[in-house]
From Swiss-Prot:
Residues 690-772 are annotated as: Disordered. Residues 624-692 form the S1 motif domain. GO terms for biological process: mRNA catabolic process; RNA processing. It is an enzyme of class 2 (transferase). Belongs to the polyribonucleotide nucleotidyltransferase family. It comes from Variovorax paradoxus (strain S110). It catalyses: RNA(n+1) + phosphate = RNA(n) + a ribonucleoside 5'-diphosphate. Residues 743-757 have a biased composition (Low complexity). Its cofactor is Mg(2+). Involved in mRNA degradation. Catalyzes the phosphorolysis of single-stranded polyribonucleotides processively in the 3'- to 5'-direction. Keywords: Cytoplasm, Magnesium, Metal-binding, Nucleotidyltransferase, RNA-binding, Transferase. The gene is pnp. This is Polyribonucleotide nucleotidyltransferase. Its EC number is 2.7.7.8.
Length: 772
């Protein structure tokens, strides 16, 4: 009998077969599922604590997506040869999984939950993130942990006017959209997308298509739960003390209503702290014991109800705006004097100082991803220090939120970047959030676009971003334009859209409730477009087009194309030539395999000098052309003349002068600069030169030249086959003491009479006796 009670379910999903298994691996986890999609295999596990920690006032859910290099048949390239801290891709995938499952845990469930996903095998054409989302959904569903799932997920492409389910990395090169959607059977919960300036209708169609396809996976998970599901936990939300709730409400409601009439964030935040502290003090004075965490939850619920009811009844929002108004915008370009490009973008109480730096191809980020190595020439980094929200905090390593916001801004801008051929720079954009009250990632998009244009990046269009919110109660709903931080926390949807006047380039949705219909999303997209056009107008007023020249402090890139066969001449043995060029010219030189050479320098004259030197190195000698160069070597039969860097030609003794030349050194010396004419080149590339072709023959001089003494390096056919040593006859007699061999480094001495060759037919030496 087997140790395992394995349950397997498979289903056809587009052109792929999906297999889900449980009961064999990781049996001590609360739930564990292995998902295999055409060779991409993931293990999803979930473990939950049976009880919440005392005083716990938030839901402690942690999602860790981990890629193992053995999944792609690789060994880690680090010094320790093992997987280290999470890569950016792993962090983003962890967030992608977290976002749709978090709202499905019940209110009041504060037990610690840890979700871990391992990628065990990877087919580069099947993304592991979708398999991971399905695996996590299945693991949670069979675990018995309180969870209102399952969820399904799908990736959607848009190729040749058609939606494509789960396109691989090859197919995505032709896709105008890369969209991931996740949700339950009834509702979409999460959307993450980038696109090539597509319309709102096409984007919404992609969301609907993806949701329909995700339901196929949900149905299969239901079948797995029926056969392998564990008993559902007997968990109930803590019963509310109605009398205590009423007491807190009576103490706090009027104070909180007054707080939310204050329009300034800082003043409102301070008043809110004072109101909450007043309630706490009153409760303490009453002598009745209470849980401070529970009181804070009740106060937040009262705040939420006040703000939501005001908005749904048509009253002004927290800062006094109506639902469609964008906060005041101010833009300043070229803020920093010595950076390559900069912009200060302020929208209400949200502000980003965004800086662009231009670099060479060597500055591109080389990423050793599981699916294969690639080079990233566009980097976007987002930072938000604690002072941006008026708080005290620690400055440490980059947080998951910062990585996610930077990735969203990058998605929004990448569609309008110039090609490498149009603009061969590596671009790094850094958004420093100096104030935050909602939608700082979209401020980063706007500031990033303006900063790059200030740096001289020829953007195809301006890109603006806007964050939308939603308040929904029963059949009433209100879509909010340009949400504040408080509206984000108190609302039901965070909906970010970025794009140009032509269409959407990035879309991100996080929905906290079920029941968001297609019609509501249509209204939200239409309202977002209206706001986007308003912001684009402000940006175009501030900076109509990109600067035509890059900053004087940025490297100037000069490109030229050479014959790929000449690349080795430019690099030289062991890189000696290119290193020497860079040291000589003070430039940075990069060579592509196709022969494209990029020269980077902040000094245009140095770049031009380097270009000329490369042209000299790679130039071909032209027949009939006159060159001037130094004598590099004197030979018995002529001299070698340097014509171009690394290219010498032979000036034969017969081509030095019209008169007979007995000794080359009578006319030439090493280092002497002479003018020569190219007579011809042979099939091996050897060049023959002439000095006398540049002068006229003196009148009356007879034509009597020595026959040419050619270089005997290639002696050609010597008349018949050479005999083997064993066929050379009897060499006769005692050879005596053998003369020392000729040393090629010593000067060769003329032969003595005794060393003259023997007459033909005679053998001067006998073969050595083998018994000597």
């Amino acid at each position: 009998m087997s140790l395992f009670n394995k349950v397997t379910k498979s289903f056809q999903w587009g052109d792929k077969t999906v297999v889900m298994e449980t009961g064999e691996i990781a049996r001590q986890a609360s739930g564990a599922v292995v998902v295999d999609i055409d060779g991409t295999v993931i293990l999803a596990t979930v473990v939950a604590s049976k009880t919440a920690k005392p005083g716990q006032d938030f839901f402690p859910l942690t999602v860790d997506y981990i890629e193992k290099t053995y999944a792609a048949g690789k060994i880690p390239g680090s010094f320790f040869k093992r997987e280290a801290k999470p890569s950016e891709h792993e962090t983003l995938t962890s967030r992608l999984i977290d976002r749709p499952i978090r709202p499905l845990f019940p209110e009041g469930f504060l037990n610690e939950v840890h979700v871990v996903i391992h990628t065990l095998s990877l087919n580069p054409e099947v993304d592991a993130d979708i398999a991971a989302m399905i695996g996590v959904s299945a693991a949670l569903s069979i675990s018995g942990i309180p969870f209102s799932g399952p969820i399904g997920a799908a990736r959607v492409g848009y190729i040749n006017g058609q939606y494509v389910l789960n396109p691989g990395q090859t197919a995505r090169k032709d896709s105008q959209m890369d969209l991931v959607v996740a949700g339950t059977e009834a509702a979409v919960l999460m959307v993450e997308s980038e696109a090539q300036q597509l319309s709102e209708e096409i984007m919404l169609g992609g969301v609907v298509f993806g949701h329909e396809q995700a339901n196929i996976a949900i149905n299969a998970i239901h079948e797995l739960v029926r056969d392998a599901g564990k008993p559902v936990w007997d968990w109930q939300a803590p019963a509310e003390d109605e009398a205590f709730v009423a007491k807190v409400k009576s103490l706090a409601e009027e104070k909180l209503r007054a707080v939310y009439q204050i329009r300034s964030k800082q003043a409102r935040t301070q008043a809110l702290r004072e109101a909450n502290a007043s309630v706490m003090n009153t409760l303490k004075e009453s002598g009745e014991p209470f849980d401070a965490g529970k009181v804070n939850d009740l106060l937040f619920a009262i705040e939420s109800k006040i703000v939501r009811s005001q908005i749904l009844s048509g009253e002004p929002r927290i800062d006094g705006r109506d639902t469609r108004t964008v906060r005041p915008i101010e833009i300043r370009n070229s803020v920093l004097p010595r950076t390559h490009g900069s912009a200060l973008f302020t929208r209400g109480e949200t502000q980003g100082l965004v800086v662009t730096t231009l670099g060479t191809e060597r500055d591109a980020q080389r990423i050793d991803a599981l699916a294969g190595e690639y080079e990233d020439r566009f980097l976007f980094h987002y930072n938000m220090p604690p002072f941006a929200t008026g708080e005290v905090g620690r400055m440490g390593s980059t947080k998951r939120r910062e990585i996610g916001h930077g990735r969203l801004a990058k998605r929004a801008l990448v569609a309008v970047l110039p090609t490498k051929e149009e603009f061969p720079y590596t671009i790094r954009v850094v958004s420093e959030i100096t104030e935050s009250n909602g939608s700082s990632s979209m401020a980063s998009v706007c500031g990033g676009c303006l900063s790059m244009m200030d740096a001289g990046v020829p953007m195809k269009a301006h890109v603006a971003g806007i964050a939308m919110g939603l308040i929904k109660e029963d059949n009433r709903f209100a879509v909010l334009t340009d949400i504040l931080g408080d509206e984000d926390h108190l609302g039901d949807m965070d909906f970010k859209v970025a794009g140009t006047t032509n269409g959407i380039t990035a879309l991100q949705m996080d929905i906290k409730i079920q029941g968001i219909t297609k019609e509501i999303m249509q209204v939200a997209l239409a309202q977002a477009k209206e706001a986007r056009m308003h912001i684009l107008g402000k940006m175009q007023e501030a900076m109509g087009e990109a600067k035509t020249e890059v900053s004087q402090f940025a490297p100037r890139l000069t490109t030229l194309k050479i014959n790929p066969e000449k690349i080795r001449d430019v690099i030289g043995k062991g890189g000696a030539v290119i290193r020497g060029l860079q040291e000589e010219t003070g430039t940075t030189i990069n060579i592509d395999e196709d022969g494209t050479i990029t020269i980077a320098s902040t000094d245009p004259e140095k770049a031009e000098f380097a270009k000329k030197r490369i042209e000299q190195i790679t130039a071909e000698v032209e027949i009939g052309k006159v060159y001037e160069g130094p004598v590099t070597k004197i030979l018995d039969f002529g001299a070698l003349i340097n014509l171009l860097p690394g290219k010498d030609g032979l000036l034969h003794i017969s081509q030095i002068a019209h008169e007979r030349v007995e000794k080359v050194t009578d006319y030439l010396s090493e280092g002497q600069i002479v003018k020569v004419k190219v007579l011809e080149t042979d099939e091996k590339g050897r060049v023959k030169l002439s000095m006398k072709a540049l002068t006229e023959r003196p009148a009356g001089m007879e034509y009597s030249e020595r026959p040419p003494r050619e270089d005997r390096g290639d002696r050609g056919d010597r008349g018949g086959e050479r005999r083997e040593r064993s066929d050379r006859g009897d060499r006769g007699g005692d050879r005596g003491e053998r003369a020392p061999r000729f040393n090629s480094e010593q000067q060769q001495q003329p032969r003595s009479n005794e060393q003259q060759p023997a007459p033909v037919g005679e053998q001067p030496y006998a073969p050595r006796d083998s018994q000597e």
